[in-house]
Amino acid sequence: MSLMNWFEDKRRFGGLIGAFIEKATKGYILNERERDKYIKIDTTKGLWTRCDSCENMLYVRFLKQNKRICEECGYHLQMSSIERIELLIDHGTWQPMYEDMVARDVLKFSDEDSYKNRVIFYQKRTGLTDAIQTGIGKLNKNLVALGVMDFQFMGGSMGSVVGEKITRLIEYAFKESLPLIIVCSSGGARMQEGTLSLMQMAKITSLLQFYQVRKKLFYIAILTYPTTGGVTASFGMLGDIIIAEPKAYIAFAGKRVIEQTLRQKIPDGFQVAESLFYSGLLDLIVPRTFLKGVLGEIFELYSLGVYKESNSYLF
């Protein structure tokens, strides 16, 4: 089935999460459940969880097999960066980069707890050094540079470490002429770092300009629930192709902030992926189960027609 036919089916069912996706997702779920009968789970964190959309109780073992998609309503629950790397990258090909980079508390920021203690807490909780993992790996045998933000680490907030790791990833992709994918999941800039976090927006954006315009290389932004604030206002919306997951919350400011500023009521659902897609702000909405295949097809098309400038290295 072509992508155009796929979208026509969604519109015919009155939305991108219609009966077609539900059936396809359930079929995928049954296949994965049979294949991964013995998947391991951490029983100390509980055996059951609840869907954020339909509130149906979900068995954690099946949920992991389902790529964290609710088998009742098709809602896409949040994934960790580790799970997303496993979803997108061919097994055994992932090479992480800059794992030892950690944030410094230069402002000595403190509210209910110090910033330093908060970082340590989330490092122990997630096993990550900060809110993003970067590296290179093969996606359907295509070598790509990949950055995956993790909302479980301080709400995926963008601080100096996140900005620097993305910057270095783009530099590496620039030098090696690799396509770039960034999976966004963030509450925005990290307030505990002040202007150091805000400047990451300009730093990443300016480097992407060289990457996309000067070197004619290919950047795909994948927006997941939630993508907000400074990430939306910078690299999140600069992809040559912008893909979102179904029903992903994508915004700059929250609904209440907008309503209080404009002093008028904002309609429900205007900041979800489907609304942005119909307004022309997104290129594709792709269910998680199909994402790797769709990206593989895009990279095949890209490899047939890519234009690369020679002798124009910035670094």
From Swiss-Prot:
Binding, Zn(2+): 51, 54, 70, 73
Subunit structure as annotated in this protein's UniProt entry: Acetyl-CoA carboxylase is a heterohexamer composed of biotin carboxyl carrier protein, biotin carboxylase and 2 subunits each of ACCase subunit alpha and ACCase plastid-coded subunit beta (accD).
Subcellular location: Plastid, Chloroplast stroma
Family of this protein: Belongs to the AccD/PCCB family.
Function: Component of the acetyl coenzyme A carboxylase (ACC) complex. Biotin carboxylase (BC) catalyzes the carboxylation of biotin on its carrier protein (BCCP) and then the CO(2) group is transferred by the transcarboxylase to acetyl-CoA to form malonyl-CoA.
Sequence ranges assigned to domain CoA carboxyltransferase N-terminal in this UniProt record: 47-315
Enzyme class name: transferase
Segments forming C4-type zinc fingers: 51-73
PANTHER family hit by this protein: ACETYL-COENZYME A CARBOXYLASE CARBOXYL TRANSFERASE SUBUNIT BETA, CHLOROPLASTIC (PTHR42995:SF5)
Cofactor descriptive note: Binds 1 zinc ion per subunit.
Molecular function terms, GO-annotated: acetyl-CoA carboxylase activity; ATP binding; carboxyl- or carbamoyltransferase activity; zinc ion binding
Entry EC no(s): 2.1.3.15
Catalytic activity: N(6)-carboxybiotinyl-L-lysyl-[protein] + acetyl-CoA = N(6)-biotinyl-L-lysyl-[protein] + malonyl-CoA
PROSITE patterns membership: COA_CT_NTER
Family annotation (InterPro entries): AcCoA_carboxyl_beta (IPR034733), Acetyl_CoA_COase_Trfase_b_su (IPR000438), ClpP/crotonase-like_dom_sf (IPR029045), COA_CT_N (IPR011762)
Gene Ontology CC terms, in alphabetical order: acetyl-CoA carboxylase complex; chloroplast stroma
Keywords carried by this UniProt record: ATP-binding, Chloroplast, Fatty acid biosynthesis, Fatty acid metabolism, Lipid biosynthesis, Lipid metabolism, Metal-binding, Nucleotide-binding, Plastid, Transferase, Zinc, Zinc-finger
GO biological process: fatty acid biosynthetic process; malonyl-CoA biosynthetic process
Cofactor(s) needed for function: Zn(2+)
Pathway recorded for this protein: Lipid metabolism; malonyl-CoA biosynthesis; malonyl-CoA from acetyl-CoA: step 1/1
Keyword check for Metal-binding: yes
Annotated protein name in UniProt: Acetyl-coenzyme A carboxylase carboxyl transferase subunit beta, chloroplastic
Primary subcellular site in the record, as a coarse category: plastid
